[in-house]
Amino acid sequence: MTDNRSGALNVQGLGHVVLKVRDLKRSVPFYRDVLGLKEVGHFGDRMVFFSVVDNHHDIALLQTREDAAAAPVDAPGLAHVALKIGDSLEELRQARAWLEANGVAISRVRDHIVSRSIYFPDPDGNELEVFVDNEEKVWLEDPELVATSKELAL
């Protein structure tokens, strides 16, 4: 379907993200037990599907070769996947404590004004972000704020 005004597609939402991993047996417990995603299906021994909310799946992990090289940091491609965990700074503090207690190396903690975030790699180096939204819709008044990023002390 297209949007009748411009001929462009009428995108109605983001369906899912598929991440390549070297070892499903290592990655599945991370996404299920550390991140708390609901494991909802498998495609043989090559893919595992997870749901964040009530969708059939939001994230899938695709097994690649165990010796596959990671993409260079400056290569085109997906930079990170962001998962909303709440709306309060206290929820973000609790998330940081949980991640650290589970051996996750935090790479950075940022205040984006519109949201506050913790970034960290999954077992294969895919960068993930957990975030809480700012209660105020400040970006409606100043769209430049969407691109703001400064260090956040938690």
Q: How should these model regions be labeled?
A:
Residues 1-8, 13-22, 70-154:
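Vicinal oxygen chelate
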Residues 58, 67-70, 135-139:
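A short local loop/turn or secondary-structure capping micro-motif enriched for an aromatic residue
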Residues 20-64:
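Core segments of cupin and vicinal oxygen chelate
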Residues 3-6, 66-72:
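Short beta-strand/turn micro-motifs at beta-sheet edges
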Residues 10-13, 36, 77, 105:
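Short loop/turn motifs at secondary-structure junctions
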Residues 16, 56-59, 80, 112:
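Histidine-centered active-site/metal-ligand motif
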